Amino acid sequence: MDGRSMIPLKDIVPSAQTNIKTQFILLDKGRTATEGQNKTCLALVADETAAVHFQLWGDECDAFEPGDIIHLTNGIFSYNRKSLVLRAGKRGNIEKVGEFTMAYVETPNMSEIRWAPDPNNSKKYVHEAVISTHSRIFPPLA
């Protein structure tokens, strides 16, 4: 384990760096799609502070199920086809560390926020607007 502390989902921001260390519960999983040689699927994940869309690749699509608690190291939060997703990326790692027992919220969804470059620091992003309070891909059950 590296020395960095875990980041709550509400504190993640878009970045080209793979440095996100966090833990969340998988709430829902979309259809598996094939992009060239790669199999992908989108999931809705959350912790006690926020929710986000999480991109699973290849064998990860079959390895994780709703209810799994997942630990992510060296993750990246960036755009994939105009959609902001959290993912492990090439250097990241995800592993199941438990199941079912984790407090979570479904709002805000960090993937449903429009981000803009920080006028004071072009390497950082700031919230510009909320596109939707809930996931538009995984609507709330209520």
For the regions a language model picked out, list residue spans one by one.
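Short interface patches used for recognition in eukaryotic signaling and trafficking proteins
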Residues: M6-P8, A51-G58
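Short nucleic-acid-contacting surface segments enriched for D/E, G, S/T with interspersed K/R
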Residues: G58-N74
